[in-house]
């Protein structure tokens, strides 16, 4: 029997998430740890499960994610992007819903680099008139 697996790669900031969907009960595993253990913040957990809410596929697929780089927010965004791309492989009819929710677009915003002569990217040292 062929084991149906759907894969998707998601990226956000410097994080990269490799996502595998298999038909199941809705169990999410990230880096071999449970979803709740890996992402303790409720707002970031909501970000991760957003593609399932948009496509009404809550609890129908088990998710196995390998995510590297970045922090919690970047990894959550990368995981969401990967899940959305994997759901497209499950059913191409999900594209309009995912596209209108903005889940298929790679968020291109990156950290602005620090400039020489400044303390941070835009923060200059305090100006003294005299």
Curated annotation (Swiss-Prot):
Biased composition regions of type Basic residues, renumbered to the chain: 116-130
Record protein name field: Small ribosomal subunit protein uS9
UniProt keyword annotation of Transmembrane helix present: no
Record field: compositional bias (Basic and acidic residues): 106-115
Gene Ontology biological process terms from the UniProt entry: translation
Record keyword Ribonucleoprotein present: yes
InterPro entries: Ribosomal_Su5_D2-typ_SF (IPR020568), Ribosomal_uS9 (IPR000754), Ribosomal_uS9_bac/plastid (IPR023035), Ribosomal_uS9_CS (IPR020574), Ribsml_uS5_D2-typ_fold_subgr (IPR014721)
GO annotations of cellular component type: cytosolic small ribosomal subunit
Taxonomic path: Bacteria, Bacillati, Bacillota, Bacilli, Lactobacillales
GO molecular function, one term: structural constituent of ribosome
Record-linked HAMAP family: Ribosomal_uS9_B (MF_00532_B)
Species in which this protein is naturally found: Oenococcus oeni (strain ATCC BAA-331 / PSU-1)
Keywords: Ribonucleoprotein, Ribosomal protein
Region annotation (Disordered) ranges: 105-130
Family: Belongs to the universal ribosomal protein uS9 family.
């Amino acid at each position: 029997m062929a084991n149906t697996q759907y894969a998707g790669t998601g990226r956000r900031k410097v994080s990269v998430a490799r996502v595998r969907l298999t038909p199941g009960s809705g169990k999410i595993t990230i880096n071999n740890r449970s979803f709740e253990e890996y992402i303790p913040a409720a707002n970031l957990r909501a970000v991760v499960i957003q593609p399932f809410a948009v496509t009404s596929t809550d609890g129908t697929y088990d998710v196995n994610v390998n995510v590297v780089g970045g922090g919690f927010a970047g990894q959550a965004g990368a995981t969401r992007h990967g899940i959305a791309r994997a759901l497209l492989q499950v059913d191409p009819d999900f594209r309009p819903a995912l596209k209108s929710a903005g889940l298929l677009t790679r968020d291109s915003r990156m950290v602005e680099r620090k400039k020489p002569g400044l303390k941070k990217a835009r923060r200059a040292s305090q100006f003294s008139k005299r």
